[in-house]
Amino acid sequence: SPELFRHLEVPEQTDLWIAYDYRTLGFEETFAPYKEVHLVAWSLGVWVATRLWAGHRSFTTATALNGTPFPMHDTLGIPTAIFEGTLHHISEEGMRRFNRRMCGDKETFNRYSELSPRPLEEIKEELESLYNQILPEKLESADPRISAFWDQAILSTEDKIFPATNLRNYWQGRCPIQEIKAPHLPFYHYQSWNELWK
């Protein structure tokens, strides 16, 4: 939810849009009034942003953070068995385990746990919708514009959702990579949005 990003400073004269509910994909807004538009996509949002905008880029910068355009893939994303296991075990206890892995350490987990949780049914609908759209995609038939879309990738070396090795496998040779010592949820390691798009 947008609460997760509340601590990040927004530069002056900057509008911030946060897209986070992926039960249906679509973005009807226009970027036309803006001189600069910086995209930061996190986790499965990297796949969503690629899907929505890879063919018609209108961004000053595009940063992929702890995700790839192939989010369910044994060597380039979340291993298929883990993705499916997460989907099939969405419950309060299952989400608690997932959140622990996502947060990586107790301090991050405690801070994240203070936020209002999204309704479990909403999370399940979202993950099922994404799974059904991701499942038929094949690496061989990928749109070649995907590789040129992203300006940089930031990957967390302690990511327990998207293995760092898989993130490296995908991003190596496609764009500059910045590695940070952080869990899958890296936002508490930053103070400002412009740290993510510089």
Predicted stretch roles:
Residues G55-H89, E126-Y131, Y190:
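Flexible "cap/lid" loop of the alpha/beta hydrolase fold
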Residues S1-G26:
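Conserved HGGG/HGGXW glycine-rich cap/lid loop of the alpha/beta-hydrolase fold
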Residues S147-A148, A153-L155, D159:
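Short beta-strand/loop motif that positions the catalytic acidic residue
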Residues P71-E114:
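Helix-rich cap/lid subdomain of alpha/beta-hydrolase
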Residues I161, Q178-W197:
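Catalytic histidine-centered segment of alpha/beta-hydrolase-like enzymes
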Residues V40-A49:
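Gly/Ala-rich beta-loop-alpha elbow adjacent to hydrolase catalytic centers
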Residues R111-E140:
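Hydrophobic, aromatic-rich cap/lid helix
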